[in-house]
Amino acid sequence: MKFPPLHFGTVVERQKRFKLLVDFDDHLEWAYLPNPGRLRELIYPGAPVWLKPVHSVKRKLAYEAVLGYDSVLVCLYAALANKLFLESLDLLGLGGNVQVLKEVSLGHSRLDFSIDGRLVEVKSVTLVQDGLGLFPDAPTKRGTKHLYELADKGEGLVVFVVQRCDAEAVTFHSAMDEDFASAMKWAKKKGVSFKAVNCIVTKEEIRPWREIPVLFPQD
């Protein structure tokens, strides 16, 4: 997936989760941050950030954050995870002549995909510590609900898309959201499968790189 030409700036402050004040050297500008995570290792005063200009009268902010840096480049755009998942089907052993449906209903929720009738929920990961991708980066009641709904059905697949290259595996972030960790363990016991993929990120593009394991450490 290619990026448009990006503009470099440094973070001045974050406001209300989705707004960044960015220093472009010659001026300050508010930008949209398309990620609800806490991003403490990526978004802080003085942090480098790469942004794309937004040319739309419907948008109030002229820039949108695309990349941050935490030893490696990290894609901040959480919504890209679904597109990256579709690019990863062969890599994850899910490709071939398959029927892909988007936004599929399950109970009172909507899950991201159905692959030949198999429900799939995709999660974007940006936090990596010591080579281990951690999800979530902020408490997620919605994510926990989806896991229990898949567990009740007794099948389905959860895919973690790590939008950086340095994760060797993925696991639940118990210290951030114990409820999600418990739901993930329960879903696995009930028959839900888990996969993960990491990505190569440059200032020009992001692309799926390789499948990595999802770990379930013992309590």
Regions found by a protein language model. Give the residues of each.
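Conserved catalytic cores of phosphodiester-cleaving nucleases, focusing on short active-site segments
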Residues: 111-137, 149-150
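Short aromatic-glycine-enriched beta-strand elements
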Residues: 16-21
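Short peripheral tails and domain-boundary helices/loops at the edges of structured domains
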Residues: 68-91
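A short acidic/basic microdomain associated with nuclease active sites
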Residues: 90-106
